[in-house]
């Protein structure tokens, strides 16, 4: 009887883990005007992942949505259409709508302080001056959400706003996109193994 109960507990725990949903949010600004800009790297990465899974984005409330599956885990890809500085409204809505836990929500953003193409994963932390991350923290009333920052480099001689809203040159574009496969693997790891293991394996 004890063994039978233990078996059912094991099955319940394993099934519950598989049934967990995940929200992967790529930050950016909607509209052709911002296509291919450094600030929209989150959008571009999600487009890459969506295409890899032979899925498509559909316009929905407060964003574009794509639903995929990764080894039995249900994954919602979200590109907010609220503009970068108001991303929190979209993130909060879809977390509540799909009943997704904070620990299962990964926010992808650009980062001026990281070299081009480098990534940094964190389980929590400050916004680091990123308005999108700041607004999400305000909407969720917490900064304890996992995030993946992608380095876009920096130009000390140019205005930062002009730089992040500028378009990647061909060399930068190639460097960034050559890393997309590795970055998408880090997201798979987050979904399957959690943020701690993923940080240990992918932070570079």
Could you tell me what each predicted segment is?
Residues 129-132:
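Hydrophobic alpha-helical segments within soluble ligand-binding/sensing domains
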Residues 152:
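Gly/charged, well-structured mid-domain segments that form the phosphate/adenylate-handling core
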Residues 168-171:
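A hydrophobic, small-residue-rich beta->alpha segment in the mid-to-C-terminal subdomain
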């Amino acid at each position: 009887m004890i063994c039978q109960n233990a078996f059912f507990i094991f099955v319940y725990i394993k099934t519950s883990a598989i049934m967990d949903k995940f929200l992967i949010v790529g930050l950016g600004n909607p509209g052709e005007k911002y296509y291919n800009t450094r600030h929209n790297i989150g959008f571009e990465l999600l487009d890459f992942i969506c295409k890899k899974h032979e899925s498509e984005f559909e316009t929905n409330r407060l964003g574009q949505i794509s639903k995929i599956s990764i080894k039995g885990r249900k994954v919602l890809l979200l590109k907010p259409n609220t503009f970068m500085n108001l991303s929190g409204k979209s993130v909060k809505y879809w977390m509540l709508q799909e009943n997704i836990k904070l620990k299962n929500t990964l926010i992808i953003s650009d980062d001026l302080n990281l070299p081009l193409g480098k990534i940094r994963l964190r389980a929590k932390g400050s916004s680091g001056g990123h308005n999108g991350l700041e607004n999400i923290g305000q909407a969720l009333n917490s900064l304890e959400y996992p995030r993946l920052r992608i380095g876009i480099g920096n130009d000390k001689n140019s205005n930062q706003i002009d730089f992040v809203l500028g378009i990647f040159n061909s060399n930068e574009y190639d460097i960034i996109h050559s890393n997309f496969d590795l970055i998408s693997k880090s997201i798979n790891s987050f979904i399957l193994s959690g943020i701690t293991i993923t940080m240990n394996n992918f932070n570079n």
